[in-house]
Amino acid sequence: MASFPSLDNDRLLRTARGEPTDCTPVWMMRQAGRYLPEYQAIRKEHSFFEVVETPELAAEVTIQPVERFSLDAAILFCDIMVVPEAMGLTVKMVSGQGPTFPKPLTTPDEMERLVEPDVESALGHVFEALTVTRHELAGRVPLIGFSGAPWTLMAYMVEGGGSKSYRAARRWLYRHPDASKALLQRTTDVIVEYLIRQVDAGAQMLQVFDSWAGLHTPENFRTFCLPYLAEIATRVKAAHPDVPLVIFAKGAHYALDALADTDYDVISLDSTMDPDAARDTVGDRAVLQGNLDPCALYAPPDVLRREVQHMLAGFGPHHHIGNLGHGMLPDHDPEHARVFVDAVHEHSRHMRTV
């Protein structure tokens, strides 16, 4: 592993390990990106995937919110679709639609189009971006790496793009359960190597995004999500036992107890999950992250501060990482993001004194 500057602010990592801190650490999913004018200026000159695939540009965009706000982490500017790309599928970023696959996997026979990638070669730009970013951060805050989860990536690979129901992908689970498991396992193997290499390249915490976990029945989650999520955590921890792992299984309320029994250190909650109930279920088995409604950032600052106080009261002063229940939205006012970040720090400090 490369040599990096020492870390000045380790509040996030200490919280993820269950250690006490002076206040609640905070970062925001999609904190780097479309709502920031400085990002928009870069996008006028470069396409989305050009930014992702150019380490210096990815590093610049990753650091932009750290320069602007008092965040406790940077998260690499990248995209979960780099894994399906590495496996041989073509991904296009279409304005107004997001990622699309011109040739999705419509039948199990089409899995023959997939390749077993040389992860180091196929995703080398990601690893280089992590290394460049880690050096440019100069120890200000830790750097988070991430990947999409096997089911969420499969949903896109089969559906061909975004969908409200992902019925084509879910149809696979019922019509082709064995092929679905084979696809999930192949994707899992790539993700594991990808995440391990991210740590080697400079990532100090890792998050797995299972954005469409909540589309499953509890039984299908246990069959088509949980085993692969658990395997990822176990295998990555075997390689890097000291690196905190976060799981974000959006919408899977019923899965909290099972996820708490895996090797993930942190469970990220979406905005529909009740922090008190989650704490009762999880106990001290995992730290919780989240979960302010992103739309609360549209509120006037005084209302937003009250929403933050309410969120923090639900989680309590310890074993909590402040975040949103999903990502920043393109039309968010950056100054309201500042209010959110500062309010988490200020009110959580106050909570520790009473």
UniProtKB/Swiss-Prot annotation:
It catalyses: uroporphyrinogen III + 4 H(+) = coproporphyrinogen III + 4 CO2. The keyword Cytoplasm applies. One of its GO terms (molecular function) is uroporphyrinogen decarboxylase activity. It comes from the Bacteria. Keywords: Cytoplasm, Decarboxylase, Lyase, Porphyrin biosynthesis. The record marks D79 as: Transition state stabilizer. It is an enzyme of class 4 (lyase). Pfam families: URO-D (PF01208). One of its GO terms (biological process) is protoporphyrinogen IX biosynthetic process. It is found in: Cytoplasm. Substrate binds at R30, Q31, A32, G33, R34, F49, D79, Y156, S211, H326. Its EC number is 4.1.1.37. InterPro entries: UROD/MetE-like_sf (IPR038071), Uroporphyrinogen_deCO2ase_HemE (IPR006361), Uroporphyrinogen_deCOase (IPR000257). One of its GO terms (cellular component) is cytosol. Pathway: Porphyrin-containing compound metabolism; protoporphyrin-IX biosynthesis; coproporphyrinogen-III from 5-aminolevulinate: step 4/4. Belongs to the uroporphyrinogen decarboxylase family. Catalyzes the decarboxylation of four acetate groups of uroporphyrinogen-III to yield coproporphyrinogen-III. This is Uroporphyrinogen decarboxylase. It comes from Salinibacter ruber (strain DSM 13855 / M31). The lineage of its organism: Bacteria, Pseudomonadati, Rhodothermota, Rhodothermia, Rhodothermales. The gene is hemE.
